[in-house]
Amino acid sequence: MKTLILAAGLGKRMNSKYPKVIHKIFNKPMINWVIETAKNFGKVAVVLGHKYELVKKVIPEDVEIYLQNQQLGTAHAVMSAIEFVSPNDNLLILYGDVPFISHETLKRLEKEHVKSNSDVTILTSILENPTGYGRIVRDGKIRIIEDKDATEEVKKIKEINTGIYIIKGNFLIENINKIENNNTQKEYYLTDILKFTDNISTVTTNDVDEITGVNNRIQLANLEKKIRRKINEKLMNQGVRIIDPNAVYIDPQVKIGRDTLIYPFTFIEGETEIGEDCVIGPLTRIKESKIGNKVTINRSEVEKSVIEDNVSVGPFARLREGTTLDENVKIGNFVETKKSSIGKNSKAQHLTYLGDATIGNNVNIGAGTITCNYDGQTKHPTYIEDNAFIGSNNSLVAPVKIGKNAITAAGSTITNNVPENSLAIARQKQINKENWVLRKGGQKNANNKK
């Protein structure tokens, strides 16, 4: 089965300079959610129109693109891509602004289409308030009557047309050009193709959210809120403790182990995996990261990092791309890491920057330590081997290596390698000038200024 995604609309109600279908839901353009689902069934094509150059940038290379130069209705959009369809194909019609249509529902639709050998199979739904939707009328044959054309009796029908169809390729090719624009909008509607056949079947979905389209920013926010609630409830049913599901933001592809506790105002995004018995949050953001078991992350930001078991992070830490923390590592308040690996049982608990650093096991990084990794043109590495002790307020000027069991004294600026089992002191000798303040009258003058 092939899929054609219609995404040429103007999206005026979004009141945006960007096309509607590239607005993001869960940090991904909404059209990409549709494309990913459609790829489960075979080849995919999209019909673009309004500002297509911007939409084209987010379309995968293996998806064919067709242009609808004028937006003259859904049937006209399909006409624009008719060469994508062969007579032996079944064509699934989807929409770029209906992002959460599920694979399971489309699989049922495909199964019914093949089983019934219908010319057209329609996905329908039941709405308590169907106002605005075309109604499915069953009076010996299946028809769609638009809301504006419906009698009071027809308006009582709650089964609606979602606009999602599977159509036989040969039937579509033979009849698409027969559709006329005899309506007030002077547009060509794909629903009119049903006039040319009685061989129609239907499948109904009870999940209204999966067939909900996005027309404005309020609908975008409301739909995302509903989907987030479902995501959180699914995780809770799988054994995750979420204290306040209304204040936790988790993307659909995130995986979280049992007995992990999520505090409010936590954002977990992208292809993130979190193990069991973790404590995450509050006020924490984790993106595209892999986290082991029994990890605590408190009021911190983690991006594209790997954290092994029994690690503690935060509060107010930032793990940037390329960070790897081995088992039992402790990263404390106001510590930042980037492209660095930190070995087992090592600690950096206060006011530290570690960039392009490789740190061994059982290393202690003193408060105020900085790896000076950038010379204005090039990044340089720092190596700290097992059991080293880095004193407080150290500047490690890369490239530099601290050997096993070595110690650097507090306040040092380390510019050369430190051998194993050595103590490095790189600071000026302290000089105390006795009674200097009294001789200069400094203290008296200072007091007079108060």
From Swiss-Prot:
List cofactor names only: Mg(2+)
Which cysteines share a disulfide bond?
none
Region annotation (Linker) maps to 218-238
Stretch list, region N-acetyltransferase: 239-450
Q: Which residues bind Mg(2+)?
A: D97, N215
The record's GO molecular-function terms, alphabetically, read: glucosamine-1-phosphate N-acetyltransferase activity; magnesium ion binding; UDP-N-acetylglucosamine diphosphorylase activity
Task: Give the primary localization class.
Answer: cytoplasm
Top enzyme class of this protein?
transferase
The subunit structure is:
Homotrimer.
What family does the Swiss-Prot or TrEMBL record give for this protein?
A: In the N-terminal section; belongs to the N-acetylglucosamine-1-phosphate uridyltransferase family. In the C-terminal section; belongs to the transferase hexapeptide repeat family.
Name the UniProt record assigns to this protein: Bifunctional protein GlmU
Encoding gene, per UniProt annotation? glmU
